[in-house]
Amino acid sequence: MARTTPIERYRNIGISAHIDAGKTTTTERVLFYTGVSHKIGEVHDGAATMDWMEQEQERGITITSAATTAFWSGMGKQFQPHRINIIDTPGHVDFTIEVERSMRVLDGAVMVYCAVGGVQPQSETVWRQANKYKVPRIAFVNKMDRTGANYLRCVEHIKTRLKGTPVPLQLNIGSEENFKGVIDLVKMKAINWSEADQGVSFDYEEIPAELLEQAQEMRMSLVEAAAEASEDLMEKYLGGEELTEEEIKKALRLRVLNNEIILVTCGSAFKNKGVQAMLDAVVDYLPAPTDVAAIDGLKLDGVTKDERHASDDEPFAALAFKIATDPFVGNLTFFRVYSGVVNSGDSVLNSVKEKRERFGRIVQMHANKREEIKEVRAGDIAAAIGLKDVTTGDTLCDEKSPIILERMEFPEPVISIAVEPKTKADQEKMGLALGRLAQEDPSFRVWTDEESGQTIIAGMGELHLDIIVDRMRREFKVEANVGKPQVAYRETIRETVKDVEGKHAKQSGGRGQYGHVVIDMYPLEAGKAYEFVNDIKGGVIPGEYIPGVDKGIREQLKSGPLAGYPVMDLGVRLHFGSYHDVDSSELAFKIAASMAFKSGYMKANPVLLEPIMKVEVETPEDYMGDVIGDLNRRRGLIEGMEDGPSGKIVRALVPLAEMFGYATALRSATQGRASYAMEFAKYSDAPNNVAQAVIEERKSK
């Protein structure tokens, strides 16, 4: 079967935003205008097409990143049909992992901002992730019809808060209840969308006289930004020549693709104005798969570099970026094809697990409706049914040309709770449910506490774990009791200790055991986790026993000698030891290494680390003193304050241990008028009194 849409006319985009910027409504309008859904689903009546889990409809927030395919030929049918794959990304900070995952497989993004709230904390997190994956992006300032809407303040925020270079493509005509439409600064025409057909038809009109001067100034800035794309254009511009509409668009596109500028559009998705022009901007300025650099990977040896270009003619390579459980067909594996073609029925290699997988049925999703297709080609996104052993981040590829595409990195959870099934019948179902949920979500972990025998679940925040427990109840019919949230403390060392010895010798009769190591232990910079350096000279320990030493240390890192928490940012250098021809074994060296670790660790000034959260509170000015006082009592470090849309914004770093129950406390202190958002910032040394209390509590257990 030949390709129906040339790859140059594909756009793989994410629509990303802060929790209440109106992203789901924006996506709904996209689906409506592209002719996919004929009735616009409103979020506030719980009927939106993209929010397809029951809980999302109840809470009015998007949790699962659903992928949808739509076609767009332009507001005035000026383009050939373009295929737009939309990945809907959640805006709540506890689901940052979903955003991270989708950024990995996107080519471009639309950042939706609220015209009233401007750039909010979660927007910064998403921005950092887009920077990390070098995703070109445009902005859509939504909710222009709301009281307090201010388009140019939002443009300013992109510069000051996100350190981006915003270039407005449009100027708004009126705002709040007088929001009428926008001025297209490239065409220098006003766009007026018809209210009779929900904004499907529109007219170009002359720019209102009172806005003409401002529009001309903004157009000059736009043309200047375009001229900076090349020396030729700059010469033409400085020489006083007019740039053509085509030259301007081509130049702006180039600068967006190079991540040099952010083009800004505006509108009100709810009032059916502006989304249409934003879709035109997606086609005009965001990349096709062929505009993006080839994807890097490694051969199966894990060392030799390899790459794949966006072409049907290269060997098949795809990345599984999401696993979802579907009530009708079981596991759905969402994947992005980077190169080649795959047909239903084909066998492929999961190169990360080195296992064969067979593509049974392949479907393309429109929110929660699905269409079966026979093949998927380079640049496309689809979901496979029935893959056996695939997790998020695995590579699926041609068996004859294996490649491992770069793996995604997932953050460590910062909060854990114990869960217990309510009845014996729930016991077995709970294990299955948690296993399935952990497969879907790599930022969620499950394990059994060896001392208490309890099942522990861990995640990125209280809301994250609430939703996991809620999904167990709804989707798997498992009732569970939930314990008190626990903070995920860590341990590390602050000093270097040299020549620490560990000797394991049992040599009385028969075959004995003998292992002897001498190591140095030293602190690593934050985020380096662990390193093992083998500095053995002259074969004093044979090569086959070295992995045993590494394993012995790694096992000790799981539970540090200080308080039994995982150890991070620690390095070990093995530089001397001895062995016995008959009695030595890998196991003996593993035991010797763990003995050395235990004896050296407590001499290396071990410290307890606690997770610190970045907290941002938006509060009316009258309550500012109370909010700051409360954050100080919670051991918070106030980083700064600024004016927000409805009062003041306070930014602080606060230990997670002090943030439990904060939502309730903030509500009562401000009569429900303040709101807050928080995300993990870093681990740092817990003060002595806190560390002592935690260590005592651990020992008493």
UniProtKB/Swiss-Prot annotation:
Does the entry annotate any disulfide bonds, and if so which pairs?
Answer: none
Q: Which UniProt keywords apply?
A: Cytoplasm, Elongation factor, GTP-binding, Nucleotide-binding, Protein biosynthesis
Q: Which residues form the tr-type G domain?
A: 8-290
What GO biological process, any one, is recorded here?
A: ribosome disassembly
Which family, according to the similarity comment?
Belongs to the TRAFAC class translation factor GTPase superfamily. Classic translation factor GTPase family. EF-G/EF-2 subfamily.
- The protein depicted here goes by the name Elongation factor G
Physiological role: Catalyzes the GTP-dependent ribosomal translocation step during translation elongation. During this step, the ribosome changes from the pre-translocational (PRE) to the post-translocational (POST) state as the newly formed A-site-bound peptidyl-tRNA and P-site-bound deacylated tRNA move to the P and E sites, respectively. Catalyzes the coordinated movement of the two tRNA molecules, the mRNA and conformational changes in the ribosome.
As recorded in Swiss-Prot or TrEMBL, the protein's gene is named: fusA
Record bears the keyword Transport = no
Source taxon at top rank: Bacteria
| List of residues binding GTP | 17-24, 88-92, 142-145
One GO MF term on file is:
translation elongation factor activity
User: Entry's PROSITE patterns?
Assistant: G_TR_1 (PS00301), G_TR_2 (PS51722)
Query: Where is the protein localized?
Result: Cytoplasm
Q: Per the annotation, which location comes first and is thus the protein's main one?
A: cytoplasm
Q: Name one GO cellular component term.
A: cytoplasm
